[in-house]
Swiss-Prot record:
Protein name, UniProt field: CTP synthase
Species of origin: Mycoplasma mycoides subsp. mycoides SC (strain CCUG 32753 / NCTC 10114 / PG1)
InterPro entries: Class_I_gatase-like, CTP_synthase, CTP_synthase_N, GATASE, GATase1_CTP_Synthase, P-loop_NTPase
Binding-site list for L-glutamine: Y54, G354, L382, G383, M384, Q385, E405, R461
Note: CTPSs have evolved a hybrid strategy for distinguishing between UTP and CTP. The overlapping regions of the product feedback inhibitory and substrate sites recognize a common feature in both compounds, the triphosphate moiety. To differentiate isosteric substrate and product pyrimidine rings, an additional pocket far from the expected kinase/ligase catalytic site, specifically recognizes the cytosine and ribose portions of the product inhibitor.
Keywords (A to Z) from UniProt: ATP-binding, Glutamine amidotransferase, Ligase, Magnesium, Metal-binding, Nucleotide-binding, Pyrimidine biosynthesis
């Protein structure tokens, strides 16, 4: 029978509930337990797939094509497990399923209410995750802050789960902000007390309180929190600021958080083995020399829009004992008059994914600069498309070469809608999830993967137009990765250059600590070797 841990947040949002939940998952997995994780978001969107990156940040894609919250990227990287659509549920998805059921008459004419119908649907997602994953522990993060009106159905649902399953099977971890007032030089615990009281008014008593702060809390402060929040002092855990999120599991392990959980939930665990985490942290410690990468994107004002790409770069850098320094370049501010000066001294250039016309010309200039100066280049999704279009314009002299996404009237549509895709609806209509890419023998990408196939995830609705393959091959572009089932181009490269590789798929979604994705590892290796 699965055990359940629910992670909630109080006082303010943005405290790092996702990192806390991920770290708990990492500690339990290091204790020999099978872990599954999920996120409940209170917003009414069905999923984040149609949300602006400025509103939501990155859309993380699961292996089965779920468009999910960026916290799932943390989950997968920390517990090194592939999650599914079951790992991401929104209020919108819950309400939609309940209302659709009502329209079909499955409720036998009953009045549809938040309790029990919405709460039952939420509980079903939790129990379904336990059944399908067969995990020892299900860790569920509840988005938002306790007290938010949007979160109340989720709080009520997890209260009911505790009632149904018992304290020995359900645990509540509450993440809060411990305030430090610099003027009076003292900690203030009242916001924590009020947050716990708000939870108590909803029928939930936290078992563990995780205090976010920039330094360890004194014993008397922990005693005060323990007294007024009715939580044992041993269960008041410090979560202090770290220079890397990958230090958090070790910091929590030092406070025996895993033992507290294992004891309450009566889990049959092994002695914890943190050797991989310690090894990874040693890599971080030894990475002092910087390499600078120009990151040419559309949404750089919100770096969370590229979270998995950034983490993948860091992970690959640490593999070579290098610290990654990002030079942020706003794509729509690059033009013919300034791109050479802006990109001068770049050790590597990366163009990530995105949608829409804005910034496209600047991205093409970045791709051209990398190609003409033999600077290692990695293009992802849109970055692959603009690299290919740039080659068509510059080397084939097709000045109007484009994608029909940006110019429906182009006479050289290098990229067009994927055949059979829904053009009328936006949500859930992309080519999504893990696909098998066949890699061409002796290509650079096949050497990087050390295989003739790559299993990577996708999120796009435009594909390369195969009518132009021979023309582009004639100027040196190699089509080294193909989705054979539908003859979709997945990877292109320029063999004449040190490293010029671009993929339609998103390799950032499969990077893990100690296991960088081959494309990122190859990209960083090329930069290191190019700067010896």
């Amino acid at each position: 029978m699965a055990k359940f841990i629910f992670v909630t947040g109080g006082v303010v949002s943005g405290l790092g509930k996702g990192i806390t939940a991920s770290s708990i998952g990492a500690l339990l997995k290091a204790s020999g337990l099978k872990v599954f994780m999920q996120k409940f978001d209170p917003y009414l969107n069905v999923d984040p797939g149609t949300m602006s990156p400025y509103q939501h940040g990155e859309v993380f894609v699961t292996k089965d094509g779920g468009e999910t919250d960026l916290d799932l990227g943390h989950y997968e990287r920390f517990i090194d497990e592939e999650l599914t659509k079951l790992s991401s549920t929104t209020s919108g998805k819950i309400y939609l399923s309940v209302i659709q059921g009502e329209r079909k008459g499955v409720n036998s004419g009953k009045t549809i209410q938040v309790v029990p119908h919405i709460t039952d649907a939420i509980k079903q997602k939790v129990y379904q995750a336990a059944k399908q994953s067969q995990a020892d522990v299900i860790i569920s993060e509840i988005g938002g802050t306790v007290g938010d009106i949007e979160s109340q159905p989720f709080i009520e649902a997890i209260r009911q789960i505790r009632l149904e399953q018992g304290k020995e099977n359900v645990m509540f971890v509450h993440v809060v902000l411990l305030l430090w007032l610099a003027a009076s030089k003292e900690y203030k615990t009242k916001p924590i007390q009020n947050s716990v009281k708000a939870m108590a008014s909803l029928g939930i008593q936290p078992d563990v309180i995780v205090c976010r702060s920039d330094s360890s809390s004194p014993k008397d402060i922990k005693e005060k929190i323990s007294l007024f929040c009715n939580v044992p002092i041993t269960n008041i855990i410090d979560a202090i600021d770290q220079d890397s999120i990958y230090r958090v599991p070790l910091a929590l392990a030092k406070q025996n958080l895993q033992d507290i959980i294992i004891e309450q939930l009566q889990l049959k665990a092994k002695n914890i083995d943190l050797s991989l985490w310690k090894q990874f942290n040693k890599k971080i410690d030894s990475s002092t020399e910087e390499i600078e990468i120009s990151f040419v994107g559309k949404y750089i004002e919100l770096q969370d829009a590229y979270l998995s790409v950034l983490e993948s770069l860091k992970i690959a850098g640490w593999e070579f004992n290098k610290k990654i320094k990002i030079r942020w370049v706003q794509a729509d501010k690059l033009d013919e008059s300034n791109y050479k000066e802006v990109l001068k001294n770049s050790q590597g250039i990366l163009v990530p994914g995105g949608f829409g016309k804005r910034g496209i010309e600047g991205m093409m200039l970045a791709s051209r600069y990398a190609r003409e100066n033999d600077i290692p280049y990695l293009g992802i999704c849109l970055g692959m498309q603009i690299a290919t279009i740039s080659i068509a314009r510059d080397l084939l002299n097709w000045s109007d070469a484009d994608s029909t996404e940006f110019n429906k009237n182009t006479t050289h549509p290098i990229f067009d809608y994927i055949k059979g895709i829904d053009r009328d609806n936006i949500g859930g209509t992309l080519r999504l999830g893990t696909m098998v890419t066949k890699l061409e023998k002796n290509s650079l990408v096949s050497k990087l993967y050390n295989s003739d196939i790559a299993l990577e995830r996708h999120r796009h609705r435009y594909e390369f137009n195969n009518e132009y393959k021979k023309d582009l091959e004639s100027v040196g572009l190699r089509f080294s990765g193909i989705y054979e089932e539908k003859n979709i181009v997945e990877v292109v490269e320029m063999p004449s250059l040190k490293f010029f590789v671009a993929s339609q798929f998103h390799p950032e979604f499969t990077s893990r600590p100690n296991k960088p994705t081959p494309l990122f590892k190859g990209f960083i290796k090329a930069i290191v070797e190019n700067n010896k």
